[in-house]
C-alpha cells in the first residue's frame, strides 16, 4: 500500500521541500502544506495563506487538518509547530491511528530547557538535524538535512588575488555578521553579503564565491553551508568539537569545514585567501562530504526507516 506522508506546516530553509521531493522519488505519496509561503523558500504543494486574527487562523488550520486526516498515514511536523494546538494534535492523531514525527531544525530548540520541549514526547519520533542538536533533544534521531545534488554542479574557487567571500545571514546578530565584516576588512578580499533574495538568485551569488563564511555563534552549520559545500566551496564556520567528533564517527569521514570563532576568523581565513589551491582542495573535500552526508535520497531512506518503526 502506498505510504502517504504530509509534511507541515512550514518550509524552513527549504528542508521540508527537499525531503518531500526525495520521498516522491522513492514512490511515497508525499506533500508539503505550509501556513504561508516564505520569500526565500516559497516551495509548497498547498499554502493555507492564513488571514485574520488568531481565532480565524486556528479555524483555517483546523479545516486543513480535517481535510488532510483521511489522506495521510504519517504527519511529519517541523520547527515545533502543528496544524492544531499541540494539546489536541497528538491525542487526535493517536485516536485516529495516525503516526507522527516532530522534526526540529535548530533555532526552535537551541538553548531551551528540557521541560520546555517535553511536549514533543507525544510525537511518535523526534528528529534533529545534527549531533550538536542532541544537547537539547538527547533521545532524538539524527537526520542531517538533505539536498538534491543533481541541482548543484560544483564551481571550483577561482585563482583571484582578491577572492570573493560570501556570507548569507538570515539574522545578522545570530550569524556574527558584524565580526565577519570586521575580519574581511583586514584581508585582501571582496565581501558579498547575500540577504533577502529569492533562493534561486541567492544561489547564483553562492556560485560566484571563492570562500564562504556561514556563522560564528551557533556551533554547527546550516543549509547555506551545505549548499556552498555542494557547489565545491570551502566553508568557514564555528563548530563544537564534540559534535564534529560524533559526526565523523557516525559517517566515517572528516568534516572538511574550517572551524573559526569571531576571535580566530582572520587567521583561519588567511590561508584560504592566500592559497587558491588550498581553496580548491577544501572545496573538493566539501563536495565529497555532502555527497556522503547530505544527499537527499539517502536522507529519504533514513526518514522511511523512522516511519516504518512508528
Annotate each predicted stretch with a short phrase.
Residues 4-9, 65-85, 101, 212-215:
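Short N-terminal targeting/anchoring amphipathic segment
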Residues 109, 121-154, 160:
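Donor nucleotide-sugar binding/catalytic pocket of nucleotide-sugar-dependent glycosyltransferases
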Residues 210, 230-234:
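A short alpha->beta transition loop at the rim of the catalytic pocket in nucleotide-sugar-dependent
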Residues 74-79, 90-110, 125-128, 142:
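Active-site proximal beta-strand in glycosyltransferases
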Residues 277-307:
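A charged, aromatic-enriched C-terminal amphipathic alpha-helix characteristic of glycosyltransferases
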Residues 234-243:
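Short hydrophobic beta-strand element within catalytic cores of glycosyltransferases
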Residues 156-175, 181-184:
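Conserved donor-binding/catalytic core segment of Leloir-type glycosyltransferases
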Amino acid at each position: 500500500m502506498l505510504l502517504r506522508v504530509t509534511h507541515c506546516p512550514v518550509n524552513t530553509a527549504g528542508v521540508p521541500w527537499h525531503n518531500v521531493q526525495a520521498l516522491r522519488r522513492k514512490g511515497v505519496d508525499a506533500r508539503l502544506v505550509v501556513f504561508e509561503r516564505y520569500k526565500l523558500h516559497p516551495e509548497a504543494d498547498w499554502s493555507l495563506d492564513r488571514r485574520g486574527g488568531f481565532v480565524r487562523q486556528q479555524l483555517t488550520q483546523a479545516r486543513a487538518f480535517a481535510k488532510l486526516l483521511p489522506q495521510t498515514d504519517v504527519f511529519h511536523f517541523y520547527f515545533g509547530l502543528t496544524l492544531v494546538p499541540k494539546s489536541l494534535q497528538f491525542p487526535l492523531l493517536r485516536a485516529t491511528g495516525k503516526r507522527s514525527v516532530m522534526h526540529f531544525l535548530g533555532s526552535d530548540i537551541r538553548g531551551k530547557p528540557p521541560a520546555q520541549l517535553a511536549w514533543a514526547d507525544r510525537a511518535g519520533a523526534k528528529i534533529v538535524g545534527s549531533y550538536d542538536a542532541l544537547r537539547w533533544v538527547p533521545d532524538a534521531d539524527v537526520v542531517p538535512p538533505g539536498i538534491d545534488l543533481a541541482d548543484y554542479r560544483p564551481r571550483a574557487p577561482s585563482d583571484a588575488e582578491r577572492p570573493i567571500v560570501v556570507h548569507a545571514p538570515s539574522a545578522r546578530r545570530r550569524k556574527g555578521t558584524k565580526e565577519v565584516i570586521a575580519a574581511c576588512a583586514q584581508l585582501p578580499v571582496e565581501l558579498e553579503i547575500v540577504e533577502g533574495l529569492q533562493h534561486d538568485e541567492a544561489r547564483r551569488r553562492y556560485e560566484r564565491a571563492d570562500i564562504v563564511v556561514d556563522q560564528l555563534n551557533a556551533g554547527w552549520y546550516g543549509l547555506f553551508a551545505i549548499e556552498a559545500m555542494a557547489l565545491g566551496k570551502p566553508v568557514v564556520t564555528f563548530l563544537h568539537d564534540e559534535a564534529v567528533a560524533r559526526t565523523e564517527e557516525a559517517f566515517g569521514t572528516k568534516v572538511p569545514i574550517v572551524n573559526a570563532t569571531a576571535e580566530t576568523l582572520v587567521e583561519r581565513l588567511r590561508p584560504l585567501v592566500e592559497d587558491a589551491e588550498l581553496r580548491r582542495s577544501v572545496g573538493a573535500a566539501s563536495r565529497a562530504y555532502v555527497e556522503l552526508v547530505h544527499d537527499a535520497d539517502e536522507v529519504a531512506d533514513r526518514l522511511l526507516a523512522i516511519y516504518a518503526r512508528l
